[in-house]
């Protein structure tokens, strides 16, 4: 009678004395994680980004919607801070003017390293619709501080802000401690210690007295102007409800 396969398997297991996986190894693999110092440091930072909210226009309203329960941005570890010395991320949302530029630069310089910047909205990235007519709007916040991530839109939706935060977390996770000194900006367009050179006002009207404009002005003066106009009938209403017609 030929034994069954199950019987052979049981006989082999009882006589061969197979060496199994040690229980100590299983316990260690479930309680110890092997990683590098860079990965551990980056994991701790990307899971606890503390943003400093710098909102000057309508883009900040969209970011304020993230605080509500519908989007719940706390799940990303974002804890808004009111002090730049406790923040490692600044989100610039809205138009930046020349008068607000020193305040923005001072806030950035007060943040500890490593620090990151998200430019949110078209007005922050390029100046937006205000840059065409306004002479005081900064045409790009990257002229003041280095930007790590650009978030276009007018304004961006809250879902786009989440996507920007996720991309920034990926960037933080790929950094190395040895390369941190090489990633610092080497040139700054504007700093707090920078002294602006005062110049004369641009709009003074002196260009009309230039020689290149004299021919056009003389041609305009020679044009006849008709000041004669027929008198239009007027009607005067008095306080005693009487009217006089001319």
UniProtKB/Swiss-Prot annotation:
Transmembrane segments: none annotated. Its EC number is 7.1.1.-. The keyword tRNA-binding does not apply. This is NAD(P)H-quinone oxidoreductase subunit K, organellar chromatophore. The gene is ndhK. GO terms for biological process: aerobic respiration; electron transport coupled proton transport. It is found in: Plastid, Organellar chromatophore thylakoid membrane. It comes from the Eukaryota. It catalyses: a quinone + NADH + H(+) = a quinol + NAD(+). Belongs to the complex I 20 kDa subunit family. HAMAP family: NDH1_NuoB. SUPFAM superfamilies: HydA/Nqo6-like. It comes from Paulinella chromatophora. [4Fe-4S] cluster binds at residues 58-59, 123, 154. It is a peripheral membrane protein.
């Amino acid at each position: 009678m030929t034994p069954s396969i199950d019987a052979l398997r049981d006989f082999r297991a009882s006589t061969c004395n197979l060496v199994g996986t040690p229980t100590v190894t299983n316990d260690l693999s479930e309680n110890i994680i092997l990683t590098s110092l860079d990965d551990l440091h980056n994991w701790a930072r990307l899971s606890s980004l503390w943003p400093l909210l710098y909102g000057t226009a309508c883009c900040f309203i969209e970011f304020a919607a993230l605080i509500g329960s519908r989007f719940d941005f706390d799940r990303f570890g974002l804890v808004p801070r009111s002090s730049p010395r406790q923040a490692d991320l600044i989100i610039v949302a809205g138009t930046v003017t020349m008068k607000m530029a020193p305040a923005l630069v001072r806030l950035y310089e007060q943040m500890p390293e490593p620090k990151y910047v998200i430019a949110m909205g078209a007005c922050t990235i390029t100046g937006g619709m205000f840059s065409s007519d306004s002479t005081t709007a900064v045409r790009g916040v990257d002229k003041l501080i280095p930007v790590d991530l650009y978030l276009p839109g007018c304004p961006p939706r809250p879902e786009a802000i989440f996507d920007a935060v996720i991309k920034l977390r990926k960037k933080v996770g790929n950094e190395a401690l040895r390369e941190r000194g090489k990633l610092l900006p080497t040139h700054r367009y504007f700093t707090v210690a920078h002294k602006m050179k005062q110049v004369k006002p641009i709009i003074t009207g002196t260009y009309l007295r230039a020689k290149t404009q004299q021919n056009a002005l003389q041609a305009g003066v020679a044009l006849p102007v008709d000041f004669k106009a027929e008198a239009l009938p007027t009607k005067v209403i008095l306080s005693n409800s009487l009217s006089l017609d001319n």
